[in-house]
Amino acid sequence: MSLIKKKNKDIRIIPLGGVGEIAKNMYIVEVDDEMFMLDAGLMFPEDEMLGVDIVIPDIQYVIENKERLKGIFLTHGHEHAIGAVSYVLEQIDAPVYGSKLTIALVKEAMKARNIKKKVRYYTVNHDSIMRFKNVNVSFFNTTHSIPDSLGVCIHTSYGSIVYTGEFKFDQSLHGHYAPDLKRMAEIGDEGVFALISDSTEAEKPGYNTPENIIEHHMYDAFAKVKGRLIVSCYASNFVRIQQVLNIASQLNRKVSFLGRSLESSFNIARKMGYFDIPKDLLIPINEVENYPKNEVIIIATGMQGEPVEALSQMARKKHKIMNIEEGDSIFLAITASANMEVIIADTLNELVRAGAHIIPNNKKIHASSHGCMEELKMMLNIMKPEYFVPVQGEFKMQIAHAKLAAETGVAPEKIFLVEKGDVISYNGKDMILNEKVQSGNILIDGIGVGDVGNIVLRDRHLLAEDGIFIAVVTLDPKNRRIAAGPEIQSRGFVYVRESEELLKEAEEKVRKIVEEGLQEKRIEWSEIKQNMRDQISKLLFESTKRRPMIIPVISEI
């Protein structure tokens, strides 16, 4: 089934996110004068991003070329793929294409942020063909941990540009999770010019354990639990949640959810028929105490670190709703990212101290939602791309995926290891990497978008590490004298009662600096403040080897 529209001239592929990181997916494909955005995801902040809520890609390049943007094409409903859509649509008018569930989740996100902008939504499936001036766009079903996941295929005269989205191959999953192998094979046979593909598990050998085997071993583990069972998993892992529901029904246990992040997405998916839930299986969390402990399963859910934080609070008897009790069993059904490993280890220790039993999370009862090495090679062999762009992973994962591509026959010079903002362009003969566009991170803190940058983060780190030191002086400029102060305030720097001599020395230093400034023919407030910063910083560092943030405050009467 050829969907080539016309003879094309120019092709460009530009990652704005989702490279060098496992999140924030956003890839721009340009064919002649038309631009297509593939996914628009967010990333949860790293530890050093103090006070930041989420991170989205910098879309300045898209804004500057917004009249060419033909649409935002979404592969699935996870935050890594759709989390930035509402922020993009605040700045750009563009139609949104996605599966039924994905579109429903985007609409809910728009509603949650109270964005009332009229948006053109197009619900697509594996049979859909979207026709544009220069190209046609089709879709194929993929398998992920959320239903209705899609790959995107942009048909050009050079062959298709295929974006797999996040995927794995698991023939035990059916219905809304089943991959469309037949359509993938057709696309590969028609000719794939460039493949843009998920690298998250490119370092993991073999295949994922099939989900039906996972569920079988989960059943065996859960059946041995005599008391209360708490399962911790991400709200976005619909496959795992369905498995727990299935097992609970078989074990005659009621299920209750603990975690706000699940409520909206779960309820949307439930109403749309994506969950199979036996009657009377679910109970409200406030009714759990009405049942014997061996008749309930609590699913503690959330995004990123929320499930682990909830367990930690329960172990420390600090949770508002429920605490860990002697004899509870815990199953942690989440993948530990690098920055979560220490937190998870500490939490497991807290749980054991509180009297809980930990169900080991081994390969028998855990599978990734991303394809391992053999699954990635399977996709490469099906698509047989001329050019290959590994994405959706840390740089070492992209390199591992590049090696797999070379093993399956892709020429090494036609494999591109890219960073954010890199432009891969077709010059009529070869794809080359010779340009860069503006890219980076936009940090979102509360309702502020982009108003937290590196300088603000640096200040937050400084405050967190060495505290703050404030010197307040009130001046009488007319009579050139100090009217009140200096008064010293510090927070997070030193314990005042044990540092009185140092603070008195700082007061005298401030007094001397100000008095010298008042003797000048022209009083330069900015110069006085800078002298206060420099000299007080030197004094404090010599005494404490710390550099607090110094804020001089000068007022006049």
Swiss-Prot record:
Keyword Nuclease included in the entry's annotation: yes
Alphabetized GO MF terms: 5'-3' RNA exonuclease activity; RNA binding; RNA endonuclease activity; zinc ion binding
Top-level taxon of the source organism: Bacteria
Keywords, comma-separated and alphabetical: Cytoplasm, Endonuclease, Exonuclease, Hydrolase, Metal-binding, Nuclease, RNA-binding, rRNA processing, Zinc
Biological processes annotated in GO: rRNA processing
EC identifiers of the protein: 3.1.-.-
Cofactor: record remark: Binds up to 2 Zn(2+) ions per subunit. It is not clear if Zn(2+) or Mg(2+) is physiologically important.
GO cellular component: a single term: cytoplasm
Record-listed Zn(2+) binding positions: H76, H78, H144, E166
SMART domains: Lactamase_B
Keyword RNA-binding appears in the UniProt entry: yes
Pfam families attached to this UniProt entry: Lactamase_B, RMMBL, RNase_J_b_CASP, RNase_J_C
Cofactor entry: Zn(2+)
Subcellular location: Cytoplasm
InterPro entries: Metallo-B-lactamas, RibonucZ/Hydroxyglut_hydro, RMMBL, RNase_J, RNase_J_2, RNase_J_b_CASP, RNase_J_bac, RNase_J_C
Binding site residues for substrate: H366, A367, S368, S369, H370
Family annotation (Gene3D superfamilies): 3.10.20.580, Metallo-hydrolase/oxidoreductase, Ribonuclease Z/Hydroxyacylglutathione hydrolase-like
Enzyme class: hydrolase
Function noted in UniProt: An RNase that has 5'-3' exonuclease and possibly endoonuclease activity. Involved in maturation of rRNA and in some organisms also mRNA maturation and/or decay.
Record family assignment: Belongs to the metallo-beta-lactamase superfamily. RNA-metabolizing metallo-beta-lactamase-like family. Bacterial RNase J subfamily.
Subunit structure: Homodimer, may be a subunit of the RNA degradosome.
Protein name in the entry: Ribonuclease J 2
